[in-house]
C-alpha cells in the first residue's frame, strides 16, 4: 500500500514544512541502521603440521614459477597471461560487475527530460512548444535498503576480481604442469634412445661372441627382443611430446601446432625443471587468505548479509522526498512553469507474508554462505598439508634417485671391466645395463613429480593469483630459530 502526497502547487512554506516533517521521521528511524560488517574468522594455527619445527618466514614470491630456473617457462607463462581467452572472459565479467554497480541507484537521483512538439488543426497554423522536465528524489534510508543493495553490487565486483585471480592461477598451474610434463617426456625419450643405442651395442657384441662360439643363439634372440621392445615404445614417447606442445600452444592462446610462433624452442631437449625451494619449508597457515576460492567464499558471505539487509529493510516503511520542475515554452515568447515537492511514504506489506518469508530465506542463505566459507577454508588447509607432505616426500625420493643412478653407473663400469676380463657373463652385463636404465627412468620420474609437487604447493597457497600485485608473500624458506 502506498500513500503519497498530491502534487503541491501551494506556497513554498508549506512544502518546506512537509520536508521538515519528512526529515524528522528519517532522523527518528536512523537509529535502526545495522552495524559494520564483521568478516568471518577462522582459528588458524601458527603453521602447518607438515612443516614440523620450521620457522614460518614469508618471501616475496608472486612469480613462483621463476624459481624453477627455466627462462622458457617464464616466457610461456607471460604469453599465456596475455593471450589466453579465459583471462579475457574473466576480465569481461569484472567489467559487467562494475557496470551493474554503477547502475545501482543512489539515495539521491536526478531524472532530466526534454521534449519538442508541433500541434495544429486544419486551417490554423501549427503551434510549436518545448518542455524541460527535471525530477528529483531523495530516499531516506534508515534501514539501509539502498546501502545494502550497493554493498551487494560492490561485493559482486570483488567476487569477479577474485574469479579472475582464480582463472589466472589455474592457467599458470596448467602451463607449468604441461611444461614440466613436456620436459619429462623429452627426458624419457632421450633415455629410451640411449637405451636403444646400448642394446644395439650389446646385440652386436652378442653376435660377435656367437661367431666365436662364446654365446648361444638364445642370447642373441633375447638381445633382439630387448631391442625390439624399446623401439616399440619410441612412437608413443614422441606422440606424448607433441601432445604436450599442442597443449602449451592452446594455453598460450594459439592453435595446436603453432607453438613455434611463441618464440621459444620446445624441441630443444632442455633439462627438467628443478625447484629451488627447501623441502623443510615453514608456512604460516593464515597465508591461505591469498587463495582466490577463500576470497570468493568470504565475499559471497558478505553479499548474502547485504541481501539479508535488503530483505529486512523491506519490512519497514520507506520515506522519500520527491520533486519535479517542468518548464514549457510556446511560440511567441510565452512560457510557464510547474513544480511539485513533497514526501512520499511507502508502507510495507502485511507482516508475516511473503516479505517475512523472503527474510527467512535470506537468513538461511547467510548460514549456507558461512558454512561454504568454512568448508572452503578447511579444504584449503587439507590441500596445503598434503601438498607439503608430497613436496617433502618427492624431494627425498629425488635425492635418493640421484644416489641410485650414481651407484648403478659405478656398478655398470665395474661389470664391463670384469666382463672384459672374462670374469662376468653377458647376462651380468645386460642386467647391469638394465638396472642403470631403470634407475635413470626412476630419477626422471622423481624429478618430474618433485617439479609438479612444487607447482601444486604454490597453487594450493594461492601464490601468483593476484595479477596486479607486484609482490605477494607466498613461498617461504626455513630459518634457524
Please report, for each region that a protein language model flagged, where it lies by residue.
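Heptad-repeat amphipathic alpha-helical coiled-coil interaction surface used
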Residues: 94-96, 101-103, 118, 150-152, ...
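A short glycine-centered flexible hinge/capping loop motif at secondary-structure junctions
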Residues: 210-214, 419-423, 460-464
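Short histidine
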Residues: 425-437, 467-475
Amino acid at each position: 500500500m502506498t500513500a503519497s502526497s498530491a502534487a503541491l502547487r501551494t506556497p513554498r512554506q508549506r512544502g518546506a514544512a512537509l520536508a521538515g516533517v519528512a526529515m524528522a521521521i528519517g532522523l527518528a528511524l536512523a537509529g535502526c541502521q545495522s552495524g559494520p560488517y564483521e568478516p568471518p574468522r577462522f582459528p588458524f594455527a601458527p603453521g602447518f603440521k607438515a612443516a614440523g619445527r620450521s620457522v614460518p618466514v614469508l618471501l616475496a614470491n608472486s612469480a613462483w614459477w621463476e624459481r624453477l630456473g627455466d627462462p622458457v617457462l617464464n616466457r610461456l607463462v607471460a604469453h599465456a597471461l596475455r593471450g589466453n581467452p579465459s583471462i579475457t572472459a574473466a576480465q569481461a565479467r569484472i567489467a559487467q560487475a562494475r557496470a551493474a554497480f554503477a547502475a545501482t541507484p543512489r539515495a539521491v537521483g536526478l531524472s532530466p527530460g526534454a521534449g519538442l512538439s508541433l500541434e495544429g488543426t486544419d486551417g490554423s497554423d501549427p503551434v510549436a512548444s518545448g518542455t524541460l522536465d527535471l525530477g528529483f528524489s531523495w530516499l531516506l534510508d534508515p534501514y539501509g535498503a539502498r546501502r545494502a543493495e550497493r554493498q551487494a553490487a560492490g561485493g559482486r565486483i570483488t567476487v569477479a576480481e577474485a574469479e579472475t585471480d582464480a582463472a589466472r592461477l589455474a592457467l599458470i598451474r596448467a602451463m607449468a604442469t604441461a611444461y614440466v610434463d613436456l620436459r619429462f617426456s623429452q627426458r624419457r625419450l632421450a633415455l629410451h634412445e640411449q637405451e636403444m643405442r646400448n642394446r644395439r651395442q650389446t646385440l652386436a657384441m652378442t653376435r660377435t661372441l656367437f661367431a666365436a662360439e662364446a654365446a648361444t643363439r638364445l642370447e642373441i634372440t633375447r638381445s633382439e627382443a630387448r631391442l625390439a621392445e624399446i623401439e616399440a615404445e619410441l612412437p608413443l614417447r614422441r606422440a606424448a611430446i607433441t601432445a604436450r606442445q599442442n597443449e602449451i600452444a592452446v594455453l598460450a592462446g594459439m592453435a595446436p601446432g603453432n607453438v613455434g610462433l611463441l618464440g621459444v624452442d620446445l624441441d630443444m631437449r632442455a633439462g627438467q625443471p628443478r625447484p629451488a625451494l627447501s623441502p623443510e619449508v615453514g608456512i604460516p597457515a593464515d597465508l591461505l587468505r591469498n587463495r582466490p576460492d577463500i576470497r570468493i567464499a568470504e565475499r559471497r558471505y558478505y553479499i548474502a548479509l547485504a541481501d539479508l539487509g535488503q530483505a529486512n529493510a523491506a519490512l519497514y516503511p520507506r520515506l522519500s522526498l520527491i520533486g519535479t520542475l517542468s518548464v514549457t515554452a510556446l511560440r511567441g515568447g510565452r512560457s510557464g512553469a510547474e513544480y511539485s515537492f513533497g514526501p512520499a511514504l511507502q508502507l510495507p506489506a502485511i507482516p508475516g507474508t511473503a516479505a517475512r518469508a523472503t527474510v527467512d530465506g535470506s537468513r538461511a542463505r547467510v548460514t549456507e554462505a558461512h558454512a561454504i566459507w568454512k568448508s572452503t577454508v578447511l579444504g584449503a588447509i587439507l590441500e596445503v598439508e598434503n601438498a607439503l607432505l608430497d613436496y617433502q616426500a618427492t624431494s627425498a625420493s629425488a635425492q635418493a634417485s640421484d644416489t641410485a643412478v650414481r651407484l648403478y653407473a659405478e656398478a655398470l663400469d665395474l661389470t664391463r671391466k670384469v666382463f672384459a676380463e672374462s670374469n662376468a657373463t653377458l647376462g651380468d652385463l645386460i642386467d647391469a645395463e638394465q638396472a642403470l636404465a631403470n634407475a635413470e627412468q626412476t630419477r626422471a620420474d622423481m624429478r618430474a613429480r618433485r617439479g609438479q609437487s612444487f607447482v601444486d604447493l604454490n597453487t594450493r597457497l594461492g601464490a601468483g593469483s593476484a595479477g596486479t600485485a607486484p609482490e605477494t608473500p607466498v613461498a617461504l624458506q626455513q630459518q634457524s630459530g
